[in-house]
Structures are given as structure tokens and as C-alpha cells.
């Protein structure tokens, strides 16, 4: 996977997939992700991202078969705060957040996605990766945007709903995602 746009510096960012936040992938005829939106905020450009890094599809049924490279970070929770994603440390290894990593060339775009601009660089080895595909495609350091205060209250496991993730081909086809497949994005929250 090459750096989107060529020579600009790219940082890989962990984006948790949580309830009440939408994630829209726009896919071209060559099965490349051309645009990515998190709650309507563009993250990218993502012109060189291959669709199968994130999901496998059955084109005959216009349906997602599997999500790939789902990153899991332990000891944190995620909530939606003022239409942005807020992550906090709990230091409890039972708490976890799942999501994707995306390349970003413009860190200012992340101000519209995350409630905190406190960036922490984390080794890829600190994550569990579900359905790993294309080993070595991501940089060894991933940035996580997390608040400075630790959450010490009770947590619960939450699931995302249908239409949280939208995958649309430039031909107007929207890939269906079976409800049971969304269970891979369970996460800890308040």
C-alpha cells in the first residue's frame, strides 16, 4: 500500500468504530477507496487504499463477506461527545475498542473527528488485529487520539447498529452488511 498522494508525510490513525457515528467508504471501479468520511468529515485523501484491506465483498450479491484488519486496543473506552469520538484510558485490560487504521495526510482533519487532540503514538504490536490481511501494509507506529484523564467508572459492552458503516461503489451500489457481521465491532463504553 503506497502513501496516498505520493510524497506527503502520512500518519496512520486508529479510528474506533462506535455507535451513533457513521463511517462512509467510497469505492471506485478498480476497488480502491477514493474517499472516507467519519461522521461526514473527510479523512484522506485515500486514493491508494485497496478495498480488500478493510473488507471482502461478494459483488454478485452486493454484500460484505468479511471485515479485515480490525484493530483492537485494550484498556480504553470510547464514547460520542459533541458529535466527535472520545477515547479514554481505563487501564482495565477487560475494556477494549475496535476499529480501523487509516492513513491521514492532514492532521487538521482529525480535529473534526476526535474530541481530544492529545496524540499518542502506539506500536502496531500493542493492538490485537482480527482477520489480519496484508501483513506489513501499515506503518509500525499508529497514532491514537485519547484524552489525558483516565475513566474510572463502570463500563459496558456496546454494539453498533445497521447503517453505521456504509460502503458505496461509484456506480451507486451500496454493499449490504449482515447484522451478525457487525458484532466484530463490539466495544467498551460508559
UniProtKB/Swiss-Prot annotation:
InterPro entries documented for this protein: CRISPR_Cmr7_comp
A Pfam family the protein falls into: Cmr7b-like
Any single biological process term in GO: defense response to virus
Keyword vocabulary terms for this entry: Antiviral defense
Family note: Belongs to the CRISPR system Cmr7 family.
Assembly with partners or alone: Homodimer.
Function: CRISPR (clustered regularly interspaced short palindromic repeat) is an adaptive immune system that provides protection against mobile genetic elements (viruses, transposable elements and conjugative plasmids). CRISPR clusters contain spacers, sequences complementary to antecedent mobile elements, and target invading nucleic acids. CRISPR clusters are transcribed and processed into CRISPR RNA (crRNA).
Full protein name: Putative CRISPR system CMR subunit Cmr7 2
Organism: Saccharolobus solfataricus (strain ATCC 35092 / DSM 1617 / JCM 11322 / P2) (Sulfolobus solfataricus)
Amino acid at each position: 500500500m503506497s502513501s496516498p498522494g505520493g510524497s506527503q508525510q502520512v500518519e496512520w490513525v486508529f479510528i474506533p468504530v462506535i455507535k451513533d457515528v457513521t463511517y462512509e467508504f467510497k469505492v471506485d471501479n478498480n476497488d480502491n477507496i477514493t474517499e472516507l468520511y467519519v461522521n461526514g468529515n473527510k479523512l484522506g485523501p485515500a486514493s491508494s487504499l485497496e478495498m480488500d484491506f478493510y473488507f471482502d465483498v461478494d459483488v454478485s450479491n452486493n454484500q460484505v463477506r468479511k471485515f479485515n484488519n480490525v484493530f483492537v486496543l485494550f484498556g480504553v473506552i470510547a464514547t460520542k461527545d459533541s458529535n466527535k469520538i472520545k477515547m479514554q484510558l481505563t487501564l482495565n485490560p477487560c475494556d477494549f475498542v475496535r476499529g480501523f487504521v487509516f492513513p491521514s495526510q492532514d492532521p487538521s482533519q482529525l480535529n473534526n473527528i476526535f474530541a481530544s487532540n492529545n496524540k499518542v503514538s502506539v506500536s502496531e504490536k500493542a493492538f490485537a488485529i482480527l482477520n489480519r490481511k496484508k501483513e506489513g501494509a501499515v506503518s509500525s507506529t499508529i497514532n491514537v487520539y485519547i484524552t489525558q484523564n483516565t475513566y474510572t467508572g463502570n463500563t459496558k459492552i456496546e454494539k453498533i447498529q445497521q447503517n453505521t458503516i456504509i460502503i458505496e461503489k461509484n456506480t451507486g451500489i451500496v454493499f449490504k452488511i449482515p447484522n451478525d457481521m457487525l458484532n466484530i465491532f463490539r466495544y467498551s463504553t460508559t
